[in-house]
From Swiss-Prot:
Family membership: Belongs to the prokaryotic/mitochondrial release factor family.
Name recorded for this polypeptide: Peptide chain release factor 1
Secretion signal span: none
Organism in which the protein naturally occurs: Buchnera aphidicola subsp. Schizaphis graminum (strain Sg)
Positions of modified residues (N5-methylglutamine): 235
Compartment(s): Cytoplasm
Membrane-spanning residues: none
Gene Ontology MF term list: translation release factor activity, codon specific
Record SMART domains: PCRF
Function: Peptide chain release factor 1 directs the termination of translation in response to the peptide chain termination codons UAG and UAA.
NCBIfam families (alphabetical): prfA, PRK00591.1
Record note on modification: Methylated by PrmC. Methylation increases the termination efficiency of RF1.
PANTHER family the UniProt entry points to: LD18447P
Amino acid sequence: MNSSIFNKLKSLRNRYEEIEIMLSQKDTISNQEKFKNLSKEYLQISEIVKNFIKWEKLETDIKNINLLFNDVEMHDIAQEELFIVKKQKKKLEEKIKILLLPVDPNDQHSCFIEIRAATGGDESSIFAGELFRMYTRYAENYMWKTEIMSSSENERGGFKEIIAKVTGKGACGRLKFESGGHRVQRVPETESQGRIHTSTCTVAIMPVRPKTKKEEIKVSDLKIDTFRSSGAGGQHVNTTDSAIRITHIPSGNVVECQDERSQHKNKAKALSILSARVYADKLAKSQKENSSMRRILLGTGERSDRNRTYNFAQNRITDHRINLTIYKLNEVLQGKLDLLIDPIMQEYQADMLSSLSEFKL
């Protein structure tokens, strides 16, 4: 075993035992904040510690079985027993490796989905609308809530741009692989000669930060403009300056919100999106430290990232990042997105495991 890994596991076990004692002490029980923090840490490391203890027991079992080989009568039994225990040990090693992988703290958070029509005119906007419906149906499968934060509709259907908030545990962890370019190939309804057109949309996934950890944005760094809404809102449309445009001067990020009748609500939505964008920019910089494969899988939400091609004529979706092709386009558009997300997550995990290549228990 890699000595640094072994020492880490021993250290975790010692800490686990230490917390166990502390949780039973009166001064800890009487201090709610301390008790809460220790309980959380205890829960976080308990699974890996329990599996490490099992591994140590299997190591001891193997040593004891090897002693049986000195007895001729026990040789066959020992050989059979050794095979079983080694198999158990190997399976446990793989589990421990996965448990040792760093956990992205944003994976359990909610997220914003930003979909923009890129090349292809009306067809691109229509496809943006279909992508939004796909993500909405996918969210329903996990009982996540979807709320439109900002949208710009296209006259012929779909959206030029739409930003939605997906609220639910684990939303960001599963949807983060959607960032990048999405390409559609099909014959548009307006095409009289039956020619296949190619259009593109970009998707960006931004984690929603907890209120206690939201990016601090200085008011002095913001330029806030109000204007009359041109979207939904009934009789109040174009009668009050309820729409908001906020520019974050240092980064150049601009967010517009006009879906609500209330200027205050539009401002609150715009600020929450802006906070997520500023944080997403920081994440993008930190991802440069990731391996090239992980950067490809996560994407950046830029047009240059080519995630998938959706070919309607062939009922085909190809994910170019892992060379995966499935002929279930209709099912995916109905929300069965795990057909694509699960293989991506497995590839991502495999790449992270490769960084633990020296870890041989």
